[in-house]
């Protein structure tokens, strides 16, 4: 083997090791990811939001990551009364990502309606070594707001394929996850099929929602500040 060939092989192996050492989430404290969601029918903007990694606490076995998202209307004014918090745990050995879905529900309800919700903690997982055909565990969460109960069911979670995706923020190697998401409760019911593109070290890059088989909204990563 020539010296040049050896260097190329070493580089490829290093890149491969780095990829395996990353999960499908951004763990760089201070990083900001800006997303834009649009209605597919007419191209109008539904919202924009910037997610900021505000805290990364490393215990040795895992990292606990806190993100804070600020949503704005198309005119730039705040969409909610406060930011939406999300807690994520990344296993340092396997790099599996676990998102506290129930906690995010509680924060969303507080931001949108100013109400306190009792949700507990329910996690949605995405392994770092996920491959096309893999089926992931379903997620069931519930929020109690006074006498009212809101349910969230995320089922039929499966990895569809690998795909290289180009968005305004750049070009990303992704896995595509399909999920059936049902939200139900007084005054709020939504039944969608979601396709989400995840890239290692970043998180999701694109998020499409289908209603009755028809693409309804598409959300893309517009920029990322590291």
Describe the residue ranges of each PLM region.
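Contiguous hydrophobic, core-forming segments of folded domains
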Residues: 61-134
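Secreted/surface-exposed cysteine- and glycine-rich disulfide frameworks
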Residues: 33, 101-168
